[in-house]
UniProtKB/Swiss-Prot annotation:
CDD domains membership: trmE (cd04164), TrmE_N (cd14858)
Assembly with partners or alone: Homodimer. Heterotetramer of two MnmE and two MnmG subunits.
Binding site for Mg(2+): 235, 256
InterPro entries noted in UniProt: G_TrmE (IPR031168), GTP-bd (IPR006073), GTP-bd_TrmE_N (IPR018948), GTPase_MnmE (IPR004520), MnmE_dom2 (IPR027368), MnmE_helical (IPR025867), P-loop_NTPase (IPR027417), Small_GTP-bd (IPR005225)
Organism: Clostridioides difficile (strain 630) (Peptoclostridium difficile)
Gene name as annotated: mnmE
Record's protein name: tRNA modification GTPase MnmE
S-S bridge residues: none
Amino acid sequence: MFIDDTIAAIATAPGEGGIGILRISGEKALKVAEEIFKSMSGKSIEEYNKRTLIYGNIVDNENIIDEVLLAYMKGPNSYTGEDVIEINCHGGFISVKKILELILSKDVRLAEAGEFTKRAFLNGRIDLSQAEAVIDVIKAKTDIAHEVAQNQLEGSLSKKIRELRDKVTEILAHVEVAIDYPEEDIEHITYQTLKEKTDELKKDIKKLYDTAESGKILREGLKTVIVGKPNVGKSSLLNSILGENRAIVTDIPGTTRDVIEEFVNIKGIPLKIVDTAGIRDTDDIVEKIGVEKSKESFTSADLIVMVLDASRKLSEEDIEILEKLKDKQTIVLLNKNDLKQEIEEEKILKYVENNSIIKISALQQEGIEELQDKIESMVYKGSIKNNSSLVVTNSRHKDALSKAYKSATDALIALEQSMPFDFVEVDLKNIWDYLGYINGDTVTEDLLDNIFHNFCIGK
């Protein structure tokens, strides 16, 4: 990518719509716009106040392509930090396509995926963590996920990383004094000071790292698999949670023969709910495939919700499923609670904790609120819901923090063992670099390409 190129792209989704938006960014943006745009007043774009919507037409050799509104944002006070033109035309494939083709004919290049945001990063308007937050804002599935992403876009994570790197700089200053002036009698004081400050730094990194598990769920969703043998009420439960008849509900065992997936917002948690085929021995080829898919879904699940028929005693099939869930985060639902209870709860307690057993009636909508509260407490543990200002949601950030934490641990061990300060210096510089991966201070071009490749073309 050449930063001195002028680029353009369609910023809105393809298809029919009320408005289509095209974006131009770069040194020639204004010149190109002046060539193809004629305002209704006859004034040039520069004669208008910046950031003003100008009414006019896009023309090609005096032929009007479309009636538009145009905005000019002069760099560096724009999204990319460059001169930016945004054209609002009528939505629809033809108008937008013809305007883009006209723009590209003026020595303008089609933007690569995420190139507008990449330029914002390269021009210093935002750092890398803020750039990545743009995608999270777009893809947020709940209010809390959106709030977390918006806070990161506004710089909450950037600020924290700067604070941590400032602490590293301070500790490094002590180390470098000790290395440069070994004859000075400051060794004992320096070791003690460094141990205290490095331990504090290590705790700060760990505290931030610990938000990553819940953050990943907010960003990607909690994969929740509903399991149980046939006809215990799994599909009724799914319909109760979704509030619609998404799954087939009958008295015939094996009705759900495939894996049904839905996203639902549970108290701010994006749940990717997977309703599986009932697990049982069967000669039906199609149902057998569904059963195998159900078993496979166990391995990748973040949470298992097992449904049991409370009106019947535990069967061998029930126990076989419970055995598979021993090491999984599991909630057991005793369904059909409106009927006489026959199930033996004490046997279930061999496999799950008491507070993970909830009595419900999926058909009567009883116990659903308690299930939602339980999921909320398992995911958030109160931390994110009460403070969504600083949460690590990106796996790349989590990996960098993990490496920074290990280096902080190594530095602390070196100090506790009174090893030469040169060893400590190496560990501290590693911490500095790993934290820099997050905000983009220490990052390679290949990594940047990989990150922005996940963006859409017009962003």
